[in-house]
Amino acid sequence: SNIVLTAGAGQRMKVPARNRVEVRFPARTLSAGTARFQVGAVSGLWADAAQFELSVYTPATTEAFAVYGTVDDGALAQPVIAPTKVYTQFGGLEISTSSTALQALTDAVLYLTAYKFECSEQLASRILAIAALRDVLSAFNAPGLPPEKDLVAAVERDIAKLQGMQNSDGGFPIWRKGRESWPFHTIHVAHALVRAQEKGFAVPDEMLAAALNYLRRIESHYPKSYSADVRNTLTAYSLYVRALLDDRDLDRARRLVGEVGVENFRMDALGWLLAVLAPSSTPEGPQIQRFLANRVVETAGMANFTTGYREEDGYLLLASNRRTDGIILDALLAVEPQSDLIPKLVRGLLAHRTAGRWGNTQENVFILLALDRYFNTYEAQTPEFVARVWLGEQYVAEYTFVGRTTEYRTTVIPMSYLAQKAGAQ
């Protein structure tokens, strides 16, 4: 069983006296599992028989190829050619469709809302997360989250805590009012306040104005120990937040690019500067876009950027590769929303989650901010459509999407069917 003898099931031969002959029967298996044999031999008046079985394993090597794309309307044609010289019992064409690229972001928000430490950066990150995903989570009715009124109350409580921590210079310390104001923490808190205000949360005007004044003088607040790389990155972040506050300093952004050179910035800084420069007609914006396009690591389905920083600078910037991807994704959505890199960056970020979230507060916040912009750019309209799949003239599947869901719909066409036709299908 589970075997086909391709040259017949019987043979006749002569066996010399006191000798032996090897008899071979060409065969092929039907499927993985077990192949069972019964063998009989007859010579004159004598006969004998035996029974045995052999394990049949899947092929030792496999190969997969994926193509990803986005369809807004109309149809998409993708030629398919079945590979030759393969085991048709294995593999096939798998087609997956979804009405959204955002897959269950609840865990990332829960991680931030339940975070047990409350320094100024962590409070700001919690505000940013809730503000950023307010539209997305309400649209998808995300399970597991506290009621919206509890999340709103948490943001209001965190804003009040931060207001109580703000120093007289407008800056924010790490833990307690009266301690040294830290440039990064101050920029990050100001970022949280403006994002919260954009989403309809109440932010004290005097609190935001004092933080903005600190940002305008940010370079005078850098300790002498800060490296040039740290200073340039923090200045870029402050310019980005000022732009969100309608205080865009285009001249300083251009001078910064001219002083440092595009190739000498950290990727994070380039993402922030791109968002500041792109609305203008200055040449620096396209220069940054070209540089980023030449530094992306791209596969058929995903994309990411890699960056590095000195270990001694890490705690001053709280940097990571995933955060960099989120920052650049947000910038590309703002300046080049039709870029083919955007859906790839989204898939790459979603694929790098562990237990539904990213590695730390900074990664979660900047990625969630970018995904919020992605949602409002590409998925603001509630899905209501039918997706149909054809292979050549053969109807394959139909998927109906009504309302928001993060589910995938998948159909598999076996290799045995694909191999029946040569050439493109």
Predicted segments — roles?
Residues 22-24, 31-229, 235-254, 272-275, ...:
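Extended, solvent-exposed functional surface patches
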Residues 2-23, 27-52, 60, 77-86, ...:
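Long, domain-scale non-catalytic interaction/scaffolding regions in large secretory-pathway
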